[in-house]
Amino acid sequence: MLKYEYQYFPDLGYSTFSSTSGVIENEMNTWMHPHRDKYFMILELNPFPFIQQPFKIGNKWTWNLGIGDHWKDDRWKTWTGSIRNDYEYEIIGKEKLKTKIGVMDCWVTQSTATSSIGSTGLIGYYNEENGFVKLDYINIDKSKLTIEIKEIR
């Protein structure tokens, strides 16, 4: 498993905190832990960024994960014990995405997570050289969050 670090830069221009997590990247797939620290704990209930070979429109796959109640929060959803998220993924397109570091060819994935407490979604934009460069989330409370690449160091 590769480790990666991400830093959070609000409009103020300085990092408020950073975090390290993991990525599995091999000839079959790329899978990464979502941002799940502090304000981003809600993303544990969303589909994880994940793309699987073959990279072609219409490719579908599934998996599931148990999620303990230590991820609950009164601000979005509470439950007792463990829930099971069932994930469905599909490559729905390929497009040129304009980012802050240039235009990138991206595979577009659409995914959902469904459990006893509700459903969430993710549209992921995956560039074969740089990985996931944009993530559009619909959260369990129906709020939306977009995470985009800003720079590569």
Label every model-predicted segment.
Residues 1-80, 108-117, 125-127:
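Signature of exported/secreted
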Residues 1, 6-8, 70-153:
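Acidic, serine/threonine-rich low-complexity disordered tracts
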